[in-house]
């Protein structure tokens, strides 16, 4: 990996700040400064040097709840979302250790004063680490946000959430709207720091993600600094456009060591006017595991903004700056989307470049010109819609991860999402399941209860269940037990 001189990095303190000039700054310098700023923030926060954040500040009333796991803050209205955003940005409340749960879909149509939850909009040249991260758990409860629109060309590092640190964002869909900014822009999260988890989150086809410079992702713009993050059971259907390089269908860039992306898919067009574009992730700088993922969206690297060579890949876009010793693993993945690029871009349907990458049981749709590649196995596109291909993807798994769902992903295989984490159907020791009056009833002590449909959709607790088969997951006395229940 090439390193910029430390003196040069420190001299760029004003870069990427609202109102600063970036005319003479190269993309590499900008990337380096963003990473330096966030690393400085992490180090300062860990050392207790940052005093302008409060983990237990007085919280707004919201629509109920106490912010505990058992009794989370309830989010029902636009005002609840605005109150959360304001509490993080203006009241400096990180909500570390606090829990939120949406109770219904929320429409932001016509709402102009909602700002991304957790952001760095008030950073200054004197204090570039002055950012407001969200550090709690936000459960969308399988509800959707509609018509979320936020456009600011001078701001960076945002999506619906801006900057999150050690947070969990789960069970949330951003169905429609448009998010657009300068750099590090994501459909769900702008920047994920220090062990962030994004689980079962989705973007809709009526949602757009636009990034004027680098680090654009359908789910998260950049995973930067601190402990490894996890992106699990997420899909992107939102068209994504960037102009300066490093763009991925799910994630723009990863600089964390040990990040995992599992059971995720990109189905949207990913258009990069420069280079370094990937169907799943744009750029890798440290160790990462990508497992049971797919790209079926059109991925393009037009190389209009760069005179140097670039790269494009159906799974990973670029590994050229990966730190020596990084372990990059791709397992049970496939690429079936069109790859569009212009010379001198280096293309590979799985991952381009010479950095050592472990690729197991992964596939790509054969090229029309008959070109073959050493990374992955080529298969005819039409054969990817057959059960034989599903069986190939499931080789080496304890249970069937991949299935074909009618009307989903143009007939190509998809993971079973949440239920893929369920390996065994067994009986718990501290709690048991019964069917009473046609409804599922749990007897005994348990810590966590989750009910899923067989296609992996998590249902809100208390929902009226129709006749059919359900997966019930309990965590009791530290043991996870899973039941298949038929009503």
List each language-model region with its residue ranges.
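Bacterial N-terminal signal peptides that target proteins for export
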Residues: 1-9
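Bacterial N-terminal signal peptides
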Residues: 9-18
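Surface-exposed repetitive/solenoidal architectures
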Residues: 24-422
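Residues that act as N-cap/strand-start positions at coil-to-secondary-structure junctions
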Residues: 2, 111, 130-132, 155, ...
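C-terminal outer-membrane/trafficking sorting elements
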Residues: 423-487
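Serine-esterase "nucleophile elbow" of acetyl-processing enzymes
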Residues: 11, 23-24
């Amino acid at each position: 990996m090439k390193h910029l001189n430390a003196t040069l990095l420190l001299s760029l303190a004003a870069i990427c700040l609202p109102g600063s000039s970036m005319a003479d700054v190269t993309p590499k310098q900008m990337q380096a400064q963003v990473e330096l700023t966030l690393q400085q923030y992490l180090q300062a926060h860990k050392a207790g040097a940052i005093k302008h954040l409060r983990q237990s500040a007085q919280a707004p009333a919201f629509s109920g709840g106490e912010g505990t796991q058992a009794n989370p803050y309830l989010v029902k209205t636009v005002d609840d979302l605005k109150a959360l955003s304001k509490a993080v940005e203006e009241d400096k409340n990180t909500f570390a250790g606090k829990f939120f749960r949406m109770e219904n879909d929320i429409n932001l149509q016509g709402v102009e004063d909602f700002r991304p939850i957790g952001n760095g909009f008030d950073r200054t040249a004197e204090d570039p680490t002055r950012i407001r991260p969200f550090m709690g758990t936000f459960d969308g409860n399988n509800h959707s946000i509609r018509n979320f629109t936020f456009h600011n060309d001078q701001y960076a590092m945002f999506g619906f959430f801006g900057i999150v640190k050690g947070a969990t964002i789960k069970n949330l869909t951003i169905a429609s709207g448009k998010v657009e900014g300068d750099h590090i822009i994501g459909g769900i999260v702008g920047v994920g720091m220090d062990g962030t988890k994004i689980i079962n989150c989705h973007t809709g086809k009526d949602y757009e993600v636009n990034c004027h410079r680098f680090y654009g992702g359908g789910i998260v713009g950049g995973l930067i600094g601190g402990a490894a993050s996890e992106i699990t059971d997420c899909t992107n259907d939102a068209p994504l456009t960037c102009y300066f390089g490093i763009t991925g269908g799910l994630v723009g860039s990863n600089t964390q060591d040990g990040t995992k992306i599992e059971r995720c898919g990109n189905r949207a067009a990913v258009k990069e006017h420069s280079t370094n574009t990937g169907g799943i992730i744009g750029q890798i700088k440290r160790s990462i595991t990508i497992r049971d993922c797919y790209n079926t969206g059109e991925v393009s690297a037009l190389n209009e903004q760069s005179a140097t060579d670039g790269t494009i890949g159906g799974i990973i876009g670029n590994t050229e700056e990966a730190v020596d010793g990084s372990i990059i693993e791709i397992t049970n993945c496939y690429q079936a989307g069109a790859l569009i690029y212009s010379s001198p871009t280096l293309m590979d349907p799985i991952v381009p470049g010479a950095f050592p990458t472990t690729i197991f049981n992964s596939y790509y749709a054969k090229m029309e010109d008959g070109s073959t590649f050493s990374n992955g196995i080529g298969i005819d596109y039409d054969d990817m819609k057959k059960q034989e291909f599903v069986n190939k993807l499931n080789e080496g798994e304890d249970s069937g991860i991949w299935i074909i769902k009618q009307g989903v992903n143009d007939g190509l295989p998809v993971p079973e999402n949440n239920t893929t984490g369920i390996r065994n159907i067994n009986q718990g020791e501290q709690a048991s399941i019964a069917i009473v009056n046609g409804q599922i009833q749990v007897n005994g002590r348990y810590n966590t209860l989750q009910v899923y449909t067989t296609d992996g959709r998590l249902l809100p607790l208390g929902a009226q269940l129709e006749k059919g088969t359900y997966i019930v997951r309990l965590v009791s006395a530290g043991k996870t037990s899973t039941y298949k229940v038929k009503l």
